[in-house]
Regions:
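Compositionally biased, charged N-terminal/linker segments
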Residues: 2-46, 141-144
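Contiguous surface segments at macromolecular interaction interfaces
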Residues: 3-16, 76-144
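Short, conserved beta-strand edge motifs with alternating hydrophobic and charged residues
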Residues: 8-10, 54-55, 66
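Short acidic/glycine-rich loop or secondary-structure boundary segments that cap or lie
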Residues: 17-19, 61-63, 77
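Short acidic (Asp/Glu) patches
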Residues: 33-38, 71-78, 107-109
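Loop/turn positions that initiate beta-strands
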Residues: 49-50
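Short, charged beta-turn/beta-strand-edge "cap" motif at the junction between a beta-strand
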Residues: 55-61
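Short beta-strand-centered aromatic/proline hotspots
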Residues: 62-72
Length: 144
């Protein structure tokens, strides 16, 4: 069995918010609408059980929750060309303290984080060390 991987999912709260995700419960929600090849390739690597940070983009720019992958890569029904896919994620818990982008950028332990390095991508990998560091910043125990 491969080790768990960690990810970060960016969403515009006006389009799909943490509250929307939480309302879906155990059924989860397909992470559709991704139209970037690299973000799509990142989703292709995801396995059921992988964890991710849920990040509100645009004005907020902060990590607000933790999600789990419950469905692996499959066709995205919103992509009429059939090029891009999606995974299914469920909300696990809200973080105890929101972690904003400025705090992430000012933490030297996170200088290599893909969120900073590949700022345009909506789905990015997070290393285990970065995951643990952000959990500390979020005052959220890394047990899910």
């Amino acid at each position: 069995k491969s080790l768990m991987e960690y990810w970060l999912f960016k969403s515009e709260p006006s389009t799909w918010s943490w509250e929307d995700q939480v309302k879906k419960g155990k059924e989860g929600e397909g992470w559709d609408g991704v139209r970037n090849y690299q973000a799509n390739n990142n989703m292709k690597k995801m396995k059921v059980g992988d964890l991710g940070f849920f990040y509100h983009s645009v004005k907020e720019k902060q990590i607000v929750g933790i999600v789990r992958v419950i469905g692996e890569h499959r066709p995205d029904p919103t992509d009429k060309k059939g090029i891009f896919g999606m995974v299914v994620i469920e909300a696990v818990k809200e973080v105890n303290k929101y972690v904003n982008l400025s705090d992430i950028k000012s933490n030297e332990n996170l200088s290599e984080l893909a969120l900073i390095k590949q700022a345009r991508l909506s789905v990015v990998p997070v290393s285990k060390a970065h995951w643990q560091e952000i959990c500390l910043m979020a005052e959220t125990e890394n047990k899910f």
